[in-house]
């Protein structure tokens, strides 16, 4: 009980009834979070680090609700690298919030409901409008949607009152351009809010963990607190080698042997999660396993499937309605799929951290030992998997490298920042940030993109904002100025210049967005490469099954059979103009 002495009696009682005692990440993380320090919690999957971050926030909201001080404003912002993970977190938040509300009612306490909402690319327009009208107390979003919220004129206002930012699975974005994009969005959020939000990061174990912590906190701020539980958790990890002689490629005989062995292992466990490295292989493995143990016992999960089919596969595994689920990295992160007894990885996962993350999807209960089997298909696989298992047993990790000053991402964010300042929502201007605590005043803006009344961004102030993002800590001023020149002067082409998104007032050293800059920033932002996809539509129902790459779809003909979601579909027609592939069940 002493570990929860800080919590409101309702919150403490709920936690004890539900979990008994705190886990190590929770017990060590709460004091830092409650002190208002930037905190990174690094612990294995299933160790309770998500609740470690949320419980302090829930406690604060419960206290405000009981005191009649809970207003219609967003105070907690949760950022997930996956839309599916965000949806899952929101569902899991509804349970404790509902139970605490019920407990309050049973004790005769008047407590308004603490609301949660999800804002991602899947959020419907009516839900977005409702969110603007009545902001949720806890908002769940993705890095890309946060960027849009910060840039769009109407949505910026709901972020003004954010007091806590939780970045989940931070290791999944820190080492690529998507992470640099998020780091700049966090600095833009910092400049927008009334007070500096407390930042909480949740991560699988990384090396060096200090680098991830600095990525979270930003440049030039007080040292972040690190709760590092380590990854030397006991694992039941082994390499499965087929009897067939290994060669440079896997033979059909070897694949049959692998399928038979997976079936054998699945019969020894209640639920089995199989990871492969490509979407195509998901369908191939699912099809072959279904032939052996029945379609009703096998599921498929990857990014080309529709959201409905992915959620259905997750639900079936969680409810024990299927024995085996085959997935790509779409299930690698902490989506709640219930109790998994065994994780199988076909071919090398190519990274130690990925192997740990995937094997860690099993054994999600106290005292359980995660169990994983690595199936090799070639000689190279054998060498990689053997080295990987040895590294895991020795406690070694891959070294995480954060990209240094990605200029394309910076250009996007500069345009978005300047466009957002031309908003009817006033912008806090940074006056000083020497000790990491930013003092602010407010500059009134205007909703017109080219209003002379808009003060714009001061060059030095914008440069300081960019430099506070950890990936840009070493950004030279000359390089920043060259990007500003490109964005204000445009790029020379045969028919003149294009791509000029900013007005640059060199006399007053101010930057303002040109007309159309906000729209360009919103529609062209992000660091995820775009791919042309055709929507697969089942006939006659009209339900969306998933997507196919444009090249594959165009080269397909009526009558061809495609596999999606462990189901064979016969193509009826490919509609090039509408980007649709009409299919029917081939069975």
Give the residues covered by each predicted segment.
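Intrinsic, low-complexity polybasic segments
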Residues: 424-430, 434-441, 449
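Conserved nucleotide-binding/hydrolysis modules and their immediate coupling elements
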Residues: 489, 494-587
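Helicase motor core with emphasis on the C-terminal RecA-like subdomain
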Residues: 1-3, 7-13, 17, 21-27, ...
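Short, intrinsically disordered, charge-balanced linker/junction segments flanking boundaries
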Residues: 414-420, 450, 585-587
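ATP-binding Walker
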Residues: 47
């Amino acid at each position: 009980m002493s570990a929860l002495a800080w919590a409101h009696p309702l919150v403490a009682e709920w936690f004890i009834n539900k979990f008994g005692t705190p886990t190590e990440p929770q017990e060590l993380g709460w004091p830092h979070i409650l002190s208002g320090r930037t905190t990174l919690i690094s612990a294995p999957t299933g160790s309770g680090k998500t609740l470690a971050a949320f419980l302090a926030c829930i406690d604060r909201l419960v206290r405000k609700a009981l005191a009649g001080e809970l207003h219609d404003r967003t105070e907690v912002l949760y950022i997930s690298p996956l839309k599916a993970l965000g949806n899952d977190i929101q569902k899991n938040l509804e349970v404790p919030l509902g139970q605490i509300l019920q407990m309050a009612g049973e004790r005769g306490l008047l407590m308004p409901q603490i609301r949660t909402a999800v804002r991602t690319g899947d959020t419907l327009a009516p839900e977005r409008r409702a969110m603007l009208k009545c902001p949720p107390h806890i908002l769940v979003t993705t890095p890309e949607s946060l960027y849009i919220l910060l840039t769009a004129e109407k949505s910026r206002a709901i972020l003004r009152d954010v007091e806590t930012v939780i970045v989940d699975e931070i290791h999944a974005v820190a080492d690529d351009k998507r992470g640099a994009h998020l780091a700049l969005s966090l600095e833009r959020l910092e400049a927008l809010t009334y007070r500096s939000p407390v930042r909480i990061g949740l991560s699988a174990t990384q090396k060096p963990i200090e680098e991830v912590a600095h990525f979270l906190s930003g440049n030039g701020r007080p040292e972040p607190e690190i709760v590092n539980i380590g990854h030397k958790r006991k694992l039941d990890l082994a390499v499965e080698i087929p009897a067939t002689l290994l060669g440079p490629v896997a033979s059909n005989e070897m694949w049959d042997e692998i399928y038979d062995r997976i079936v054998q292992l699945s019969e020894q466990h209640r639920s089995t999660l199989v990871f492969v490295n490509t979407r195509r292989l998901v369908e191939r493995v699912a099809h072959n396993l279904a032939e052996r143990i029945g379609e009703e016992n096998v599921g498929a999960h990857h990014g080309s499937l529709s959201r409905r089919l992915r959620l259905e596969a997750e639900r079936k595994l969680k409810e024990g309605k299927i024995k085996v689920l085959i997935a790509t990295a779409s299930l690698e992160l902490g989506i709640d799929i219930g109790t998994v007894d065994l994780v199988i990885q076909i071919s090398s996962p190519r990274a130690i951290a990925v192997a740990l993350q995937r094997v860690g999807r099993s054994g999600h209960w106290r005292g359980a030992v995660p169990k994983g089997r690595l199936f090799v298909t070639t000689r190279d696989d054998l060498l990689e998997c053997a080295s990987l298992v040895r590294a895991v047993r020795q406690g070694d990790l891959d070294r995480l490298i954060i990209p240094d000053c990605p200029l394309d991402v910076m250009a996007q964010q500069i345009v978005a920042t300047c466009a957002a300042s031309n908003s009817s929502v006033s912008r806090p201007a940074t006056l000083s940030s020497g000790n990491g605590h930013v003092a602010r005043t407010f500059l009134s803006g205007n909703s017109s993109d080219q209003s002379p009344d808009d003060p714009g961004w001061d060059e030095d102030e914008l440069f300081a904002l960019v430099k506070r993002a950890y990936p840009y800590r070493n950004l030279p001023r000359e390089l920043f100025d060259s990007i500003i020149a490109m964005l204000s002067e445009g790029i020379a082409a045969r028919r003149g210049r294009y791509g000029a998104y900013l007005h640059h007032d060199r006399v007053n050293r101010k930057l303002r967005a040109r007309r159309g800059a906000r729209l360009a920033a919103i529609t062209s932002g992000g660091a995820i490469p775009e791919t042309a996809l055709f929507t697969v539509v089942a006939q006659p129902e009209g339900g969306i099954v998933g997507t196919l790459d444009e090249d594959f779809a165009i080269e397909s003909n009526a009558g061809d059979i495609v596999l999606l979601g462990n189901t064979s579909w016969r193509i009826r027609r490919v509609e090039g103009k509408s980007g649709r592939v009409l299919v029917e069940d081939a069975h």
